[in-house]
Amino acid sequence: MTILHSTDFFKAGISTVAIEPRLPQSAFPEHHHDFHEIVIVEQGTGIHVFNGQPYTIGGGSVCFIRDHDRHLYEHTDNLCLTNVLYRAPDAFRFLAGVSQLLPQEQEGNYPSHWRVNQTVLQQVRHIVAQMEAMGSETDTHAVASREILFMQLLVLLRKSSLAEEATNNDARLNQLLAWLEDHFAQEICWEEVAAQFSLSLRTLHRQLKQQTGLTPQRYLNRVRLMKARHLLRHSDESVTDIAFRCGFGDSNHFSTLFRREFDWSPRDIRQGRDAILQ
């Protein structure tokens, strides 16, 4: 597994924060690093496999990666993101208590993936741009200023996370997408789901297309297919059982969609024939 080292990203030993844009981020094999990072997705779509679990990410997704986590990107489509790197929650020169603003693991569950709406994403971009504009300056004032901006970023993300009440269509769409990650196997009636999150069906179609480039059904199928591929790789269940478990009522239709999405059949994945590309 590839290991990324802080010495390659932090310009000087005194630096505590670094910015690494990926415009776009292509598929990248599984890796981990000896630093922490916050991944901010600006646009496009892709699959983020985090500690073995696949997540569909798009504009507004925010991912919190710790130094012992492993992750990879695949199936990317114009995925543009910015990585905000920091050495560790307790490795700042002028900040204390940073961990209180970060996701907290509870009973083995680490809420690593958040979403913010487009308005907040613009504010995030502004803060990151200020950090990036400072370049590699390492004098005391520059380090302090960069850490202040990092704290502003954390506070903004925390306040804007899904724990906040959905008060506009962007926030409601984000909550709907998070709900789909947990309920993808259910029979979905889009009119009912849209109403559940106080969205009109027309608004749902328009905003999801803008944020992910996909229609609601295409997005749902992609989530289902990603979950199915994970099970094919990491379980002994039959292809038919996995198809039904992931929300497909017909295993032949599932196999057709699967091959169209990944250029491999479910049997190929089960037998590891795609491993050479991983």
From Swiss-Prot:
GO terms for molecular function: DNA-binding transcription factor activity; sequence-specific DNA binding. Keywords: Activator, Cytoplasm, DNA-binding, Repeat, Rhamnose metabolism, Transcription, Transcription regulation. Residues 174-272 form the HTH araC/xylS-type domain. GO terms for cellular component: cytoplasm. It is found in: Cytoplasm. GO terms for biological process: positive regulation of DNA-templated transcription; rhamnose metabolic process. Residues 191-212, 239-262 bind DNA. The record marks D241, D250 as: Interaction with sigma-70. It comes from the Bacteria. Signal peptide: none annotated. Its main location: cytoplasm. Activates expression of the rhaBAD and rhaT operons. NCBIfam families: PRK13503.1. Binds DNA as a dimer. This is HTH-type transcriptional activator RhaS. It comes from Klebsiella pneumoniae (strain 342).
